[in-house]
């Protein structure tokens, strides 16, 4: 094919984070994060794509131990049975990294794949991901991914917050 392809830019796993907030009905919200976040930014034919892979087993929850147990359980993230959380974006214009906007793609969670759209925040640096974070926010419905347990305690929406740094070219 006549497409121009550049080598992928991998995420810097030590500088990239994935965190989330669960909204509880009668208690303060619960925050969590994943300590193993990998991925890459690919360029092909003038468009870019991003793939993100999170190891669900690396889940760390703030707050009481019961929240961590509940979040890891089969009723919620089912991290032991489905440890891979994966997002693959649709191709997008490289200006999206600077200007911000909707980042659309497929999210795989709990062994189920669904369309997802996240908000990519604008950046002010020359090389997004290298000189500053690529910051992505969004929300997913627990119900869409089969997380129907604890509905009396946990609201449906889970807020996601990704901050990505890329390995600088020449430092691989």
What are the functions of these language-model segments?
Residues 1-172:
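Low-complexity, acidic/polar, glycine-enriched regions of mature
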């Amino acid at each position: 094919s006549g497409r121009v392809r550049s080598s992928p830019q991998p995420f810097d796993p030590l500088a990239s984070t994935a965190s989330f907030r669960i909204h509880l009905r009668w208690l303060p919200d619960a925050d969590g994060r994943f300590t193993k976040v990998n991925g890459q930014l690919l360029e092909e034919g003038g468009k870019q794509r991003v793939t993100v892979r999170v190891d669900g087993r690396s889940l760390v929850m703030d707050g009481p131990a019961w929240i961590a147990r509940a979040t890891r359980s089969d009723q919620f993230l089912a991290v032991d049975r489905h440890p891979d959380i994966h997002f693959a974006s649709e191709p997008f214009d490289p200006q999206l990294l600077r200007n911000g906007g909707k980042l659309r793609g497929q999210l795989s969670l709990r062994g189920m794949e669904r369309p997802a759209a996240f908000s990519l925040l604008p950046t002010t640096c020359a090389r997004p991901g290298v000189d500053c974070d690529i910051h992505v926010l969004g929300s997913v419905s627990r119900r869409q991914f089969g997380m129907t347990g604890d509905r009396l305690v946990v609201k449906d929406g889970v807020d996601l917050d990704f901050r990505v740094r890329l390995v600088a070219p020449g430092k691989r």
